[in-house]
Regions:
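Active-site glycine-rich loops that stabilize anionic/oxyanionic intermediates
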Residues: 598, 605-610, 621
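N-terminal cap/lid segment of alpha/beta-hydrolase-fold proteins
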Residues: 553-596
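N-terminal signal peptide c-region/cleavage motif recognized by signal peptidases
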Residues: 24-25
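Bacterial N-terminal signal peptides that target proteins for export
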Residues: 2-16
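Short hydrophobic segments within beta-strands
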Residues: 585, 603-604, 692, 763
C-alpha cells in the first residue's frame, strides 16, 4: 500500500513519505522594487524566477513508499522531476468529465515513477530489480495478496504503450505479462484472490480506428427537463459531452475487455467488452461485481452519473444476477446530504466468501424531508436467489463498513448539515443483536477524534479490521489533535468495554505517525518520523521497554546547504473571541530585534464550522519538517520574506445560522487579527504585507482586497470570483442561488471589483476542469479590475488544469509571483508605490 500523510484515512499502512522542499537563504537579502511589469503581450513566453526559486523546483524529490501486506518489505518508487510542457501539452480528449490520453488510452494526467527498488523493513537493506523496462514509467503499483509479486503499469506516451509488468519479489526480476491496457478509469488491473492471477482491462482486439467527425453537424444537441421532477441541483461540471460525435468517441475509448491474466502471462477473456466503471472479484474469487455504463448519455453530468447496470457475473463473465439498473442522475435535491435513490456504494463484504453490501436512501435522497431512517444498509449473499436482508437502518448517510468477521464490523454514518459522525459496532452474522454506539462526535471537533481503525490485508487481498492476537481488541491510529498541537498516536481498544489503551504517542522534538503494528516478539510498530530539519523517514520501533527506534530509510534534506528556517506555531484571537492558529516562518538568520520587521506573505484557505469552539482548536504541529515546495508560499523565504502559512480563517455558523451568512465579516476579522499579530511580534511591516491563495484561497484573496486595505498586494491562483456562475452551491454552501441570493452576491468579489485598490495578480490554468473554477472566472475578474482602473495582471497557463504540472508553468508561476511581490512589497515602508 502506498504511504502518504494521513487525512481521514482508514488504512494504517498507507502513507507516502513525500517530504517537501525546504529552501533557506542568507540572513538578509535586499528587496528592491522592480520595474512595473508591462501589459500582457503576445509571445512573452515562459519565464524563469530567480536562481533560489529555481532550486526549489529542481531539488530532488523524496521517493514514495509502498508497504507490503506483511509489513516486512517496502517498494520504493523514485518520482522524477516535473514533466515538460511538451509532455503536458500532448493531445488529450475531454469527454464526460474525463481527460483521456488517446495514444495510451489512459488518464491523461497521470504521474509516474522513474526508478523502482525493494527495501527491507527489518534492517533497511535495499535490493535492486533486474529486467525493468527502460525508460521506466510506473503509473500504478500494487502488491499481490501473498506478497510474492509487485504489479505495475508501464506507460509510454511516445509509443502509446500501456503495459502490465510483474516483479518476482524473491528473484528480484521484472517481466511484461500484458499489453494494450485501458486505464482511463482506475489502474486497468487488479489482483484476484490468492495472487496467482490478475483481472486486466484491455482494449478490445480488432477495435479499429476511432470514429472521425466529418465536420458536418448531424443535428442540434438537445437537452430537456422531466415534467414534475422538482428542484434538482446540478453542479457546474466541465469537459462534458457536447454532441453525438463526442458520444461516439467516448464509447470508443471507454470500451474495455476484461481478461484474466495469470502470473505466467496466459490470458483468458472474461465476459464481454463494455464501458466498465467497476469490476471486482468476490473474496472467494467465484463472482465478479460489474458496473457498466449504458446509453442514454448526458451533456450535463459526468460519466459517474450516467445510467448503469449493476450485475453479478460468474468467474467466466456470465450473468448470474442483476442487482439494479440505475437511471441517469442529472440532478439531486438541494443540500450536501442529498444522494441518488436506489443502490448506492455497493461493494463486496470483505470477510465473507461472496456477499454484497450497499445502501439505499429511505428519504428519497432528499435531506429536507422529515425521516427517522435516512439510509438502509442491505446485505445479499451468494447465490443471490433470495431478497437482501437489512444490516442496519441509519438516521443519517451510510459512510462505509470496516469488516473483521461475522461477530464484528464497524459501521459508519455521517450527516453533513450537523457534521455529526457516528460509528457502530455490529455483528453482521447476528442481525438480531443490537448495535453498540462506539463514536458520536462532530467531525469538526478534532480533539475528540478517536482515530481510524487499523486495517490489515488478508489472504484474499481484502482490507479488514486488524484484531489483537487474543481477538479481544482492535487498534486505532489518530492525529492526536490537542491544545499542544498534533501528537499522533496508536491505541488498543478493548471490544468488551470500549476502553482505549495508549500503545504509542509521538514525542517532541519529532512528529511521528504510526503506520502499522505487529504483535510477534513483544510487538513492533512502523512509523514515519520527521523533525523541523529532517524529512519524514520510515522507522521501526519495538514495543519492548527501553528499545531504541531503528531508522529504515535515511532521506536527507533535499537542499542540505539551505537550512535554518525558524517555525513557530502561533495562537491569537480575533475580535469575536475565536482563537486562531498559524505557522509563522522566519528566513534563515533573521533576527527581529536586530533586523527589524520584514515584508510578509500570508497564504490561507478558509474553512466552514458549525461551532466556534471547534473553529478555535489548534491544528498542525510545530515539529513537522519545514517542507517548502514550489506550490506553497514558503519558497519566498528565499527572498527574505516572513511567511505566515495557513492562518486559520474559520467561517462559523452555529445552530440554524449558516456560516456564509457572515462570510465577509468573519474573513475580514480573521485577516485583521493575523496582520495585527505579525506586527505585534515585530516581524511584519504593516505597510508591506501581501495575501495569497489557491482556489478557495484565491476567492478569499480577492474578497480581502475588495473589503480591506490590510494588504499591499494579492496573488489569486485558479479562483472563482462570481458566485452566480456556481448557482447550485460551492464549498460547504448547500443553498442554491435562488434560496440565498443576497449571500451569493455579497460573497462575490466580482461585485466589489471597484473597491479593489491594491494590486492583484491572477494566475489560472487554461484547461482548469475543477467544478466551479472555470478559467473565465479569472478572465472576467481581471477585466473588471482593469476596466475600473485597478492594478492587476492576468497570467493564463496553457494546458494546465486546476493544479499546474509542467516545469515551465511552475517556473512562470513563481517568476510572476516573485516579480509581483518584489514590485509591491520590495519598496521601503512608506515609499509611494
Amino acid at each position: 500500500m502506498k504511504l502518504s500523510p494521513p487525512h481521514r484515512r482508514r488504512a494504517s499502512a498507507a502513507l507516502v513519505l513525500c517530504a517537501g522542499l525546504l529552501l533557506a537563504v542568507p540572513p538578509v537579502m535586499a528587496l528592491t522594487p522592480l520595474p512595473a511589469p508591462q501589459g500582457a503581450q503576445q509571445g512573452e513566453g515562459y519565464r524563469l524566477p530567480s536562481a533560489a526559486l529555481q532550486a526549489v523546483v529542481d531539488a530532488p524529490r523524496t521517493p514514495s513508499l509502498y508497504l507490503s501486506p506483511k509489513g516486512d518489505l517496502t517498494a520504493v518508487l523514485q518520482i522524477p522531476a516535473l514533466p515538460s510542457i511538451a509532455q503536458v501539452a500532448a493531445p488529450e480528449l475531454k469527454l464526460a468529465g474525463l481527460r483521456i490520453h488517446p495514444k495510451t488510452v489512459s488518464d491523461s494526467r497521470f504521474s509516474f515513477g522513474s526508478k523502482l527498488w525493494l527495501a527491507s523493513n527489518i534492517d533497511g537493506k535495499e535490493r535492486q530489480i533486474t529486467g525493468l523496462p527502460q525508460p521506466l514509467s510506473v503509473a500504478a503499483l500494487t502488491w499481490s495478496p501473498d506478497q510474492k509479486y509487485l504489479a505495475f503499469n508501464q506507460l509510454d506516451p511516445a509509443t502509446g504503450a500501456n503495459e502490465l509488468w510483474l516483479v518476482d519479489v524473491q528473484a528480484g526480476s521484472a517481466r511484461r505479462v500484458a499489453e494494450r491496457l485501458n486505464s482511463i478509469v482506475g489502474t486497468g488491473y487488479a489482483w484476484l484472490p490468492g495472487g496467482d492471477a490478475l483481472l486486466v482491462m484491455q482494449r478490445p482486439a480488432g477495435q479499429g480506428a476511432p470514429p472521425q467527425a466529418d465536420g458536418v453537424p448531424t443535428g442540434p444537441a438537445v437537452q430537456q427537463t422531466e415534467v414534475g421532477q422538482g428542484v434538482r441541483s446540478v453542479r457546474t461540471y466541465q469537459d462534458m459531452l457536447k454532441n453525438e460525435d463526442d458520444a461516439r468517441l467516448f464509447e470508443y475509448y471507454m470500451q474495455a475487455q476484461p481478461v484474466r491474466v495469470s502470473i505466467n502471462g496466459d490470458s483468458t477473456p472474461v465476459g464481454t467488452a463494455g464501458i466498465y466503471l467497476g469490476l471486482s472479484a468476490s473474496p472467494d474469487g467465484k463472482y465478479l461485481l460489474s458496473q457498466r455504463v449504458q446509453r442514454p448519455f448526458s451533456y450535463a453530468v459526468p460519466v459517474n452519473r450516467f445510467p448503469r447496470n449493476i450485475e453479478v457475473l460468474d468467474a467466466q463473465g456470465k450473468l448470474v444476477h442483476t442487482v439494479a439498473r440505475l437511471p441517469l442522475v442529472d440532478g439531486l435535491p438541494t443540500g450536501n446530504d442529498a444522494v441518488p435513490t436506489g443502490v448506492r456504494s455497493i461493494s463486496w463484504r470483505a470477510d465473507a466468501p461472496a456477499s454484497l453490501v450497499w445502501a439505499e436512501a429511505q428519504d428519497g435522497g432528499d435531506p429536507s424531508r422529515e425521516a427517522k431512517v435516512r439510509d438502509a444498509v442491505l446485505l445479499q449473499p451468494a447465490p443471490f436467489d433470495k431478497p437482501p436482508v437489512t444490516l442496519a437502518q441509519l438516521g443519517s448517510r451510510y459512510a462505509g463498513v470496516t469488516w473483521a468477521n461475522g461477530e464484528l464490523a464497524l459501521l459508519d454514518e455521517y450527516w453533513w448539515k450537523s457534521r455529526e459522525v457516528k460509528q457502530w459496532k455490529i455483528a453482521p452474522d447476528h442481525l438480531d443483536q443490537a448495535a453498540t454506539l462506539l463514536v458520536q462526535r462532530s467531525e469538526d471537533d478534532r480533539y475528540s477524534d478517536p482515530g481510524e481503525p487499523v486495517l490489515h490485508t488478508d489472504d484474499a487481498g481484502r482490507s479488514r479490521l486488524q484484531l489483537s492476537a487474543d481477538g479481544n481488541s482492535f487498534y486505532r491510529i489518530g492525529e492526536g489533535a490537542s491544545a499542544e498541537g498534533d501528537r499522533p498516536f496508536l491505541d488498543r481498544v478493548e471490544l468488551s468495554s470500549g476502553k482505549s489503551e495508549r500503545v504509542f504517542q509521538s514525542q517532541a522534538p519529532y512528529y511521528e505517525m504510526p503506520l502499522s503494528i505487529s504483535e510477534g516478539e513483544g510487538g513492533r510498530i512502523l512509523t514515519y518520523r520527521e523533525s523541523n530539519d529532517v524529512p519524514a523517514n520510515l522507522v521501526a520501533r519495538s514495543l519492548a521497554a527501553d528499545a531504541q527506534p531503528v531508522e529504515l530509510t535515511h532521506f536527507a534534506h533535499p537542499l542540505p546547504a539551505l537550512r535554518g528556517v525558524k517555525k513557530e506555531q502561533i495562537r491569537y484571537k480575533r475580535a469575536d473571541g475565536v482563537e486562531l492558529t498559524a505557522d509563522l516562518l522566519l528566513p534563515p538568520g533573521y533576527d527581529a530585534k536586530k533586523d527589524g520587521p520584514r515584508p510578509v506573505l500570508m497564504w490561507a484557505y478558509p474553512a466552514e464550522f458549525k461551532s466556534a469552539a471547534d473553529a478555535s482548536q489548534v491544528s498542525g504541529s510545530k515539529y513537522r519538517f519545514n517542507a517548502i515546495s514550489y506550490w506553497g508560499p514558503q519558497a519566498f523565504l528565499a527572498k527574505g520574506y516572513v511567511v505566515l502559512n495557513d492562518p486559520t480563517m474559520p467561517i462559523v455558523g452555529e445552530g440554524d445560522t449558516e456560516p456564509n451568512d457572515t462570510y465577509v465579516q468573519q474573513l475580514v476579522a480573521s485577516a485583521q487579527a493575523a496582520v495585527d499579530e505579525v506586527v505585534k511580534r515585530g516581524v511584519g511591516d504593516r505597510e508591506r504585507i501581501a495575501v495569497g491563495g489557491h482556489s478557495f484561497g484565491a476567492f478569499m484573496t480577492a474578497n480581502l482586497l475588495a473589503h480591506t486595505r490590510l494588504f499591499k498586494a494579492g496573488i489569486a491562483r485558479s479562483g472563482a470570483y462570481n458566485r452566480t456562475l456556481t448557482p447550485f452551491g460551492f464549498q460547504a454552501e448547500e443553498r442554491n442561488y435562488w434560496q440565498a441570493q443576497d449571500v451569493y452576491q455579497k460573497m462575490s468579489p466580482f461585485n466589489y471589483a471597484d473597491r479593489i485598490k491594491d494590486p492583484i495578480l491572477f494566475i489560472h490554468g487554461v484547461d482548469d476542469n475543477n467544478s466551479g473554477t472555470f478559467p473565465i472566472q479569472s478572465e472576467r475578474m481581471f477585466a473588471a479590475v482593469k476596466g475600473l482602473g485597478g492594478t492587476s495582471r492576468l497570467v493564463m497557463l496553457p494546458n494546465e488544469s486546476h493544479g499546474y504540472r509542467a516545469r515551465e508553468s511552475i517556473m512562470t508561476m513563481l517568476a510572476e509571483s516573485e516579480d509581483w511581490l518584489d514590485q509591491w512589497l520590495g519598496a521601503e515602508a512608506g515609499k509611494k508605490r
